[in-house]
């Protein structure tokens, strides 16, 4: 007993010296209730992907990678995240390494262009230095880097076209992420990197696909989303969009390998009401009787949503209050409701 007290006393003195030398919070007891906080997130803009992440969105203070083939919806997901961050009153930045941002499309997705910070860097070092400065400022909530493949090292740009520059980009990413990872956690910002897929030559077994920029991003990313283009969405004979299949291949804040299916309409982005209809039916929030669909409100009133899926989607677009109520009910089922979203529900019940 005396030995345990002595150990405790020595430990307390050691902790005190560490805090004096390195500042308060440099070391802490994990079980201390004042230190353990629920994971804060920025919503993805898709309720299906919010559910798949397990925490309701992209975790703050972490690095996220969204990767997939060309035209699979990576930039669209990143822009939706920016729109969600801005809705929460946050500051967002877009590092356009590809020099391909379409402002009109971004605006259609709900991005406030007047408050969006944008940079079109000349080379990879400049892009990552800008990211580091924004993170260290502590006032930027979301930073999107589009894309890792376009982060060309300065030496490669200044060299001749045929010069062999082995591993330059991988070394650049490794060095930058070592700097950024620590400051991201303190700033509570989310840094999203979009990335492209390349083929490994000579692979006989397993997947030949890999992402650009070396292995560093795979290690430092808390969450990695694999995005794949699915079947086309048609209105009559016209193709108006496509299904996007998302798989959470890495997740440090919730169980990984969950999948989600979302729907992107060309020129408009993710169709929220289309998602609500499909998830609502799957979760029993929306009931079906024959070809008609119904929803029972929090007040106990049964509302007819329409006959056939397309009419239900149109009804939800025209009645945003019911759409929001259905969304809250779905999120509640998965335990994803934030405190700010619980208040309207309580108000409805009290009335």
Curated annotation (Swiss-Prot):
Instruction: Kindly give the InterPro entries that the UniProt entry links to this protein.
Output: AAA+_ATPase (IPR003593), DNA_recomb/repair_RecA (IPR013765), DNA_recomb/repair_RecA_CS (IPR020584), P-loop_NTPase (IPR027417), RecA-like_C (IPR049261), RecA-like_N (IPR049428), RecA_ATP-bd (IPR020588), RecA_C_sf (IPR023400)
Keywords (alphabetical) are: ATP-binding, Cytoplasm, DNA damage, DNA recombination, DNA repair, DNA-binding, Nucleotide-binding, SOS response
Q: Read off the Pfam families from this record.
A: RecA, RecA_C
| Gene3D superfamilies hit by this protein | P-loop containing nucleotide triphosphate hydrolases
Question: Per the record, GO CC terms?
Answer: cytosol
Q: Which GO terms describe its biological process?
A: DNA recombination; DNA repair; SOS response
UniProt-annotated location(s): Cytoplasm
Q: What is its main location?
A: cytoplasm
Detail which positions bind ATP.
68-75
Q: Which GO terms describe its molecular function?
A: ATP binding; ATP hydrolysis activity; ATP-dependent DNA damage sensor activity; damaged DNA binding; single-stranded DNA binding
Give the family this protein belongs to, as stated in its UniProt record.
Belongs to the RecA family.
Cited function: Can catalyze the hydrolysis of ATP in the presence of single-stranded DNA, the ATP-dependent uptake of single-stranded DNA by duplex DNA, and the ATP-dependent hybridization of homologous single-stranded DNAs. It interacts with LexA causing its activation and leading to its autocatalytic cleavage.
Put simply, this protein is called Protein RecA
Give the originating organism: Thermotoga neapolitana (strain ATCC 49049 / DSM 4359 / NBRC 107923 / NS-E)
**Gene encoding this polypeptide?**
recA
